[in-house]
Amino acid sequence: MELKVTTLEGKEAGSVQLSDEIFGLDPRVDIIQRCVNWQLAKRQAGTHKAKGRAEVWRTGKKMYKQKGTGGARHGSQRVPQFRGGGRAFGPVVRSHAFDLPKKVRALALKHALSAKAKDGGLIVIESATLEAAKTKALVGHFSGLGLTSALIIDGAELNNGFAVAARNIPNIDVLPIQGINVYDILRRQKLVLTKAAVDALEARFK
């Protein structure tokens, strides 16, 4: 697959050949969904907690005598049916994370990249560098490229000027190649890769 390369200013800068094994797959929604669910489950705090009947503060004394009242045979006031009683099967502090094989994660990333390429949401730029960290200048560049919602992936190290300038622009995310992931690719309309990012991806999946 061949794709045009543009500069940050919107000028043409040749073309790049993309591997069909990474960008030319027929997207599998089920594999992508598995990876997104894995990511979202892994980042859940899991700090939810409700007190059970063993944890609430209530007296342990029997409420009233066993017989002769005409009422139910209650003992503890800590049971769930009473106000102030413990919650039955309430949430506990736990990890929501589950395992997903590394090969499935790698495949999901390929399918997410292929989905963006298929939908026309993939853009390759020559480099993501700015001499001065000026947000106004970067907004102008993005406007020229038609970017309102985008994930920008650079090489192993981000250009400091570019990263700082992009930090305050809504719906724009900037990540190094090590941080590329399925969820962030899907949550933005466009995926912008630098030539360094393309080379790193092809080296990673070689």
Swiss-Prot record:
One of its GO terms (biological process) is translation. Transmembrane segments: none annotated. GO terms for cellular component: ribonucleoprotein complex; ribosome. Keywords: Ribonucleoprotein, Ribosomal protein, RNA-binding, rRNA-binding. One of its GO terms (molecular function) is structural constituent of ribosome. InterPro entries: Ribosomal_uL4, Ribosomal_uL4-like, Ribosomal_uL4_dom_sf. One of the primary rRNA binding proteins, this protein initially binds near the 5'-end of the 23S rRNA. It is important during the early stages of 50S assembly. It makes multiple contacts with different domains of the 23S rRNA in the assembled 50S subunit and ribosome. Part of the 50S ribosomal subunit. Belongs to the universal ribosomal protein uL4 family. This is Large ribosomal subunit protein uL4.
